[in-house]
Amino acid sequence: MSDEVFSTTLAYTKSPKVTKRTTFQDELIRAITARSARQRSSEYSDDFDSDEIVSLGDFSDTSADENSVNKKMNDFHISDDEEKNPSKLLFLKTNKSNGNITKDEPVCAIKNEEEMAPDGCEDIVVKSFSESQNKDEEFEKDKIKMKPKPRILSIKSTSSAENNSLDTDDHFKPSPRPRSMLKKKSHMEEKDGLEDKETALSEELELHSAPSSLPTPNGIQLEAEKKAFSENLDPEDSCLTSLASSSLKQILGDSFSPGSEGNASGKDPNEEITENHNSLKSDENKENSFSADHVTTAVEKSKESQVTADDLEEEKAKAELIMDDDRTVDPLLSKSQSILISTSATASSKKTIEDRNIKNKKSTNNRASSASARLMTSEFLKKSSSKRRTPSTTTSSHYLGTLKVLDQKPSQKQSIEPDRADNIRAAVYQEWLEKKNVYLHEMHRIKRIESENLRIQNEQKKAAKREEALASFEAWKAMKEKEAKKIAAKKRLEEKNKKKTEEENAARKGEALQAFEKWKEKKMEYLKEKNRKEREYERAKKQKEEETVAEKKKDNLTAVEKWNEKKEAFFKQKEKEKINEKRKEELKRAEKKDKDKQAINEYEKWLENKEKQERIERKQKKRHSFLESEALPPWSPPSRTVFAKVF
């Protein structure tokens, strides 16, 4: 039976209509069931297998289905009844074909799937088919009894173990869907995964940044201060204040160290007061100079970037010199200085806070004030150092010996005691000093007079040079005036000559124009006469040509008339000749007719004679039949008739 069902050639011998219909219907049912089983197996394999198998199955579905259908449908031969009545499909002889269909269908499906799937996916496809074989057979048996309809996706009923496994994996296993939906879902899942990763990263960053952003009271104060300063300050001013505050702290810490409390020297109270007053002034000026210097350096760093480390070193050196000078001050003074330093530091910090609101215009004023402060501090430093470094009388050194006495002027006590050698020496020395001073003053006066004389001489020389220069300038001016007059006279002469030449040229142009006008008139008259003569000549020529043309026309007309006459005569002759020829032809025709009549008559006569002779011959043959046996002559001419001898 299986051979009969799956035979490629249809059984036309038994019952043609029934066999055609049953074989066609059975094969059609087989193709439909195989397709449905293949689609179900591919869907479940897509659900349980990886995405790679899905992508491989996409390429092989349509081609494999078409190949399987084409293989089975190649040898079908549809009858005329089926073409006329396609709706009357009767499922006859189904009992014979059902068992064979169920037996052979899994093999065909497995073969088609092996053709579709790649080598690496064969085991997975075979497993999926083996799981779905039993259910496919039951479904096919039910479907063969019914009419074929469009496929509806049915939910697969699994075993208890499979149900348990599915219950555990319900949260991640999707329901079976078409391939296009699976592809779209995979793309959407990738996008959702990327979005989940981004949200997780953002949450982690927020968690990490949360503890760092917890507010503290110190932080709140700092932020409030920063906001207040940032509202009042430009970015350049903020740089200035930071640099100024740091530099002030360093330099003030270096300059006002506790080592400044040195040993006090033995001085008078007035000198100590003056020294304290000067030192306090110098310290205040120094602080102002430091603050102004560092403000200017900060501005220059932020704007021009031209302040170097040498300025800082010089300022440190100045501070060290000041500290060396201040080591001789009393401890009370050092305490007062420390108090003043603290107050000045607070004042300077307040000043820096106020200066933060000031912009670039006040930085120039700060530079000027810093320069003046530096000059003032240098003067105060010089004064204080000169006063402090003056040695007292009590502590003066005695290494000069008795030469110091010479510098002292003789007092009343010394004048009372003139015998002492030191006093004599001092008096002599003082007289010599007075004479020397007088001499020096005289020499200085002489030098001053000489310098004045030299100055006067130089002034006189300069005046003489100026007078000479003025005289030379006047002479040069007079020479230039003469030359200018000469040049002006030359220019006037040149202008006169130019005017004369222009007038002469104008007169020549006028004469030339008059001559040209005359020549033009003559030329026009000549051309008019020439044109008139040419016109007359052309007229005469035209008349001659017209006459010649008229003569030629006359000659032509006469020639044409003669030719026409000749032509008419020639045509008349031709007509006459044609008439003569016609007559001759008619005569010939008449002669021919006569000859034909004569020939016909002669022919008729000849025929009559011939008939007569034939009759005579026939009669003679009948009469003399016995003479036929006699030998004929060896040759007889065809035109001549040989008569037999009559006995």
Curated annotation (Swiss-Prot):
InterPro entries named in the record: MAP9
Compositionally biased residues, Low complexity: 365-374
Keywords: Acetylation, Cell cycle, Cell division, Coiled coil, Cytoplasm, Cytoskeleton, Microtubule, Mitosis, Phosphoprotein
Residue stretches of biased makeup (Basic and acidic residues): 133-145, 187-200, 268-287
Localization annotation: Cytoplasm; Cytoplasm, Cytoskeleton; Cytoplasm, Cytoskeleton, Spindle
Keyword rRNA-binding assigned: no
GO cellular component, one term: axon
Biased composition (Polar residues): 155-166, 210-219, 239-249
Residue numbers carrying Phosphotyrosine: 12
Any one GO BP annotation for this protein: mitotic spindle assembly
Coiled-coil segments on the chain, per record: 184-210, 298-328, 443-628
Gene Ontology MF terms in the entry: microtubule binding
Segments of skewed composition (Basic residues): 174-186
Modified residues (N-acetylserine): 2
Region annotation Disordered: where it falls in the sequence: 127-323, 344-421, 491-514, 530-553, 580-600, 613-647
Chief site of localization: cytoplasm
Its job: Involved in organization of the bipolar mitotic spindle. Required for bipolar spindle assembly, mitosis progression and cytokinesis. May act by stabilizing interphase microtubules.
Oligomeric and partner information: Binds to purified microtubules via its C-terminus.
Protein name: Microtubule-associated protein 9
Source organism (scientific name): Homo sapiens
